[in-house]
A protein has these predicted regions:
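Core catalytic lobe of class I
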Residues: 1-316
Length: 316
C-alpha cells in the first residue's frame, strides 16, 4: 500500500480499495452540514436532512473501521448547525469561509423534532450513530478557540468551540498519554509539598501515601525528593487551540496543532495516518512533521493541488 499520497476521489470509493487492518490512525474533519456548496457531485454536507447527512458519514466511517487496525484510533472534528428557513445563513464554516471554498447554501436545515432556530445537535447525533455502528466512543474533546469566526447573532452567545470525538475500533488501542501530557503549574507542585520548601524531610501531600520519609539520603538530615513530585498531568479534554489562517487559500484551516495532538496520542512513530476529507492537507502536514506516514483522500481537485503545495510532494 502506498503512503504519503493524495487520492483525488470520492472518499467511500477510495476507502473500499484499501486493505483491511492497515491504518493506525484517522484524523479528519468532514464538511459541516448545510453550510457550504463546493460545486462537486457526491459532496457530503448538501443533503436535504441531517439524518441523510449522518447516514452518509456513518457509511464512510464504517469503511474506515474496516481499514483501521484493531489498535487504531479515530479522531473526528465536527461542529453543529442550527435549523433555519432555507435562506443563506450568517454562520460561516470556520474551515472554509469564502471565495474559492464554496458558496453559502440555502438548505432548509430541518430535522425531526427541531423547530426553526433550534440547535440540531449534529455532533452528538453522529457520535451516537457511530457508537450504534460498533465504534467505541471514548472521549468528547472540546476544541476551544480564542479567535473564532464572528457571528451576527444577538439572541445567544457566539460559538467558540467544536467537538473532537475520540473513537476506537476495539477496547484496547494505542494511546500515548505521555506524548501529550500537560505540565503541572508551580502552584500545583507547591501543594504536593504542603507548602514546604524542597529541603523538607517529610511531605504529607504525596497522593495515597500520607507522610512519607524522603528516600533520598544525600544529606545527613534528609530532604524532600523533588523526583517524587509529578511534573506533568494527563491531558484534559478541553483544548485551547487557535485557528490558523492559510495565506495560500485565504481561509482558516484545521489547525496543525490540533492534528498534531491527535497524532501524537493516537499513532505510533512510523505509523500511517489517514484523512478521508483531506482538504488543504493539514493532517498530512502534521503527520509528516511527526515522523508518520499519511494517506489523504479529497474529492476536490483544487484542494488536492493546495495540499500538494503545502506538504511538498508525494511518494510513489
Amino acid at each position: 500500500m502506498k503512503t504519503d499520497v493524495i487520492i483525488n476521489r470520492d472518499c467511500l470509493m477510495a476507502l473500499r480499495e484499501l486493505p483491511t487492518d492497515s491504518v493506525h490512525c484517522c484524523v479528519t474533519s468532514p464538511p459541516y452540514y448545510a453550510l457550504r456548496d463546493y460545486g462537486m457531485d457526491a459532496q457530503i454536507g448538501r443533503e436535504d436532512t441531517p439524518e441523510e447527512y449522518i447516514k452518509r458519514l456513518v457509511a464512510v466511517f464504517h469503511e474506515l473501521k474496516r481499514i483501521l487496525r484493531p489498535d487504531g484510533t479515530f479522531w473526528l472534528n465536527i461542529a453543529d448547525t442550527y435549523c433555519g428557513t432555507g435562506s443563506k445563513g450568517s454562520y460561516t464554516d470556520p474551515k472554509n469561509p469564502k471565495g474559492r471554498n464554496g458558496q453559502s447554501v440555502s438548505i432548509a436545515r430541518t430535522a425531526a423534532g427541531c423547530k426553526q432556530k433550534d440547535l440540531i445537535g449534529i455532533p452528538w447525533l453522529l457520535a451516537f450513530a457511530l457508537r450504534a455502528d460498533g465504534w467505541y466512543l471514548r472521549s468528547d474533546i472540546i476544541w476551544c478557540k480564542a479567535n473564532p469566526m464572528p457571528e451576527s447573532c444577538k439572541d445567544r452567545p457566539s460559538r467558540c468551540y467544536e467537538h473532537v470525538f475520540l473513537l476506537t475500533k476495539s477496547k484496547q488501542y494505542f494511546y500515548d498519554a505521555a506524548a501529550i501530557a500537560e505540565p503541572i503549574a508551580p502552584t500545583s507542585a507547591a501543594r504536593y509539598r504542603g507548602g514546604r520548601s524542597a529541603n523538607s524531610k517529610y511531605s504529607s501531600e504525596v497522593p495515597g501515601q500520607g507522610k512519607v520519609q524522603n528516600i533520598n539520603k544525600a544529606r545527613s538530615g534528609g530532604y524532600y525528593d523533588d523526583a517524587l513530585i509529578p511534573t506533568t498531568r494527563n491531558k484534559r479534554d478541553v483544548w485551547h487551540i487557535n485557528t490558523v489562517p492559510y495565506k495560500g487559500g485565504h481561509f482558516a484551516t484545521f489547525p496543525p496543532k490540533l492534528a498534531e495532538t491527535c497524532i501524537l496520542a493516537g499513532c505510533p512513530k512510523g505509523g500511517i495516518v489517514i484523512d478521508p476529507f483531506f482538504g488543504s492537507g493539514t493532517t498530512g502536514l502534521a503527520a509528516q512533521a511527526l515522523g508518520r506516514c499519511y494517506i489523504g483522500i479529497e474529492l476536490n481537485v483544487d484542494y488536492c493541488a493546495l495540499a500538494r503545495a503545502r506538504i511538498g510532494g508525494e511518494k510513489g
